[in-house]
């Protein structure tokens, strides 16, 4: 399907993601960064000119959270779920920063997450580490940084970031 047709199908509910390393600044969201389908198409063309690839995805509505899992090639040790500070300025009015930090409550929980949400995210990270080992013949060593979103339809994986890998 062509870009404009797919955007028309999604309406105002889309995200354009650079498929590559962008320092946390490759995602543009309809309504926040992109104010029309033309804006989205211009961004797509900019990415193509850079020699890059991109994804156009349906925008998910909910609360984002991250789950880091330390991997030694065999085992995973999960950190508490956290929420990222993605944007500069008060009230998240500025551009994406590429990561200013994360937070959780003093009890290491997030008020919008249930234990079942965290267990599901942990299971997804575990299954991903297992699949990487099966595909490449050796276990991943580093930090698997899963970006998730808790929606009305449940928890969904948005992306992975890899650290020290």
Describe each model-derived feature in a short phrase:
Residues 11, 25-165:
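Internal nucleotide-binding/catalytic subdomain
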Residues 14:
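Short beta-strand/loop motifs in extracellular/secreted proteins, especially
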């Amino acid at each position: 399907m062509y870009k404009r047709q797919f955007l028309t199908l999604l309406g105002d509910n889309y995200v354009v993601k650079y498929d590559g390393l962008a320092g946390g600044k490759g995602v543009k969201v309809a309504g926040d960064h992109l104010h029309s389908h033309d804006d989205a198409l211009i961004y797509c063309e900019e990415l193509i000119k850079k020699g890059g690839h991109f994804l156009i995805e349906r925008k998910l509505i909910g609360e984002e959270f991250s789950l880091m899992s330390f991997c030694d090639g065999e085992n995973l040790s999960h950190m508490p779920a956290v929420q990222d500070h993605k944007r500069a300025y008060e009230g998240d009015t500025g551009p994406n920063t590429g990561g200013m930090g994360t937070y959780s409550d003093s009890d290491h929980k997030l008020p919008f997450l249930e234990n079942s949400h965290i267990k599901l995210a942990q299971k997804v990270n575990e299954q991903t580490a297992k699949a990487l080992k099966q595909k490449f013949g050796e276990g991943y060593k580093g930090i698997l940084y899963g970006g998730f979103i808790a929606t009305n339809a449940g928890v969904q994986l948005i992306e992975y970031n890899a650290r020290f890998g």
